[in-house]
């Protein structure tokens, strides 16, 4: 079941997306935030984290997106593994899903 994020526009606008930047979605889940971030990227990269294997069904087929099926506590390691020293923005939807 797809979850429509609350305050989607406000959350993503707050990142002030650089079309060529590197962004992290630490709570990929249904992919709603990630899809919106990808709409705003040109040549940038988005790395999405989710340790829940159910999230795999929501991974977009997009060369600018990298899915990491692990807890985001490893974000620094995976960021470096993907060839980046730092990110331009991080989104984490830490609310309760109902």
Task: Name every feature range the model reports, one short phrase each.
Residues 85-98:
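Long, charge-dense, solvent-exposed interaction surfaces that engage phosphate-rich ligands
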């Amino acid at each position: 079941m797809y979850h429509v994020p609350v305050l989607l526009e406000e959350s993503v606008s707050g990142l002030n997306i650089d079309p060529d930047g590197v962004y992290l979605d630490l709570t990929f889940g249904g992919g709603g935030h990630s899809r919106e971030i990808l709409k705003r990227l040109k040549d940038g990269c988005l790395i999405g984290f989710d340790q829940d294997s159910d999230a795999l069904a929501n991974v977009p087929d997009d060369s600018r997106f990298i899915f990491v099926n692990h807890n985001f506590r490893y974000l620094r390691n995976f960021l470096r593994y993907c060839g980046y020293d730092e990110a331009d923005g991080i989104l984490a939807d830490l609310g309760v899903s109902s």
